[in-house]
C-alpha cells in the first residue's frame, strides 16, 4: 500500500483506466477498506457498480493530488474526488476481443491531452469513455457475427466516427458532483 501510494504521489498521473477487476485490485491494494469486494457479487450487479464507484471516490480522496479513475465493465464508471459519471455506451462484444482495453486507454490519453484543468480532464475522461463505447456499438452494427470481423469493425469505427454520431448516441447515467 505505502509503495503504491508513494509511487502515485511521485508520478501524479492524470488518470488510471482499467476494467472492474483491475480497478478493484488497485483499491484493494490501497487498503481503503470501503467494501469494494461487493464488486464480485454477481447476484447484485447494480449494488456492485455503486460499491465500486464509492470505493473509487473514497480512494481518490486519500490522494494528495487530483486524479481520475475510469473502470470499464457492464457500465463504465468515471470518478474524480468530487464528480462521478456512469457511461452506458458499449457492446458486450468488446470484452471478448483482445486489445479493446488498450484501445480505450489510448482514446482516453488522446482526450486528456487537450484538457487543461481538472474539471476539463474529468469531462474529457467521460467523453473518451463514451466515444469508445459508441465505437463498440457501431462496430456491432457493422459486423454482426464473429470476433475477427468485429475487431476490424471497431478499428474502422474509431477512425470514422463523427461528432454527430457521438452526440446522437451518447448515453450517460447519473452524473453527480459531490462536495468534499
At which residue positions do the language-model features occur?
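Conserved phosphate/ATP/ADP-binding segment of small-molecule kinases
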Residues: 3-84
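Electropositive phosphate-/nucleotide-binding environments in soluble metabolic enzymes
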Residues: 20, 50, 102, 118-122, ...
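Short, small-residue alpha-helix embedded
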Residues: 25, 98-131
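Glycine-rich phosphate/pyrophosphate-binding loop at beta-loop-alpha junctions
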Residues: 79-89, 128-145
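Short pre-catalytic strand/loop immediately N-terminal to key active-site residues, enriched for Gly-Thr
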Residues: 87-99
Amino acid at each position: 500500500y505505502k509503495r503504491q501510494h508513494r509511487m502515485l504521489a511521485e508520478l501524479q498521473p492524470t488518470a488510471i483506466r482499467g476494467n472492474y477487476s483491475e480497478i478493484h485490485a488497485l483499491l484493494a491494494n490501497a487498503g481503503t477498506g470501503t467494501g469494494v469486494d461487493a464488486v464480485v457479487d454477481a447476484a447484485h450487479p447494480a449494488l456492485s457498480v455503486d460499491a465500486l464507484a464509492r470505493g473509487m471516490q473514497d480512494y481518490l480522496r486519500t490522494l494528495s493530488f487530483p486524479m481520475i479513475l475510469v473502470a470499464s465493465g457492464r457500465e463504465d464508471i468515471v470518478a474524480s474526488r468530487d464528480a462521478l459519471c456512469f457511461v452506458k455506451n458499449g457492446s458486450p462484444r468488446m470484452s471478448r476481443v483482445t486489445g479493446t482495453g488498450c484501445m480505450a486507454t489510448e482514446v482516453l490519453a488522446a482526450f486528456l491531452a487537450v484538457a487543461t484543468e481538472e474539471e476539463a480532464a474529468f469531462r474529457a475522461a467521460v467523453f473518451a469513455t463514451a466515444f469508445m463505447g459508441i465505437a463498440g456499438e457501431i462496430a456491432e452494427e457493422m459486423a454482426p457475427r464473429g470476433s475477427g470481423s468485429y475487431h476490424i469493425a471497431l478499428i474502422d469505427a474509431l477512425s470514422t466516427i463523427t461528432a454527430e454520431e457521438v452526440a446522437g448516441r451518447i448515453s450517460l447515467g447519473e452524473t453527480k458532483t459531490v462536495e468534499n
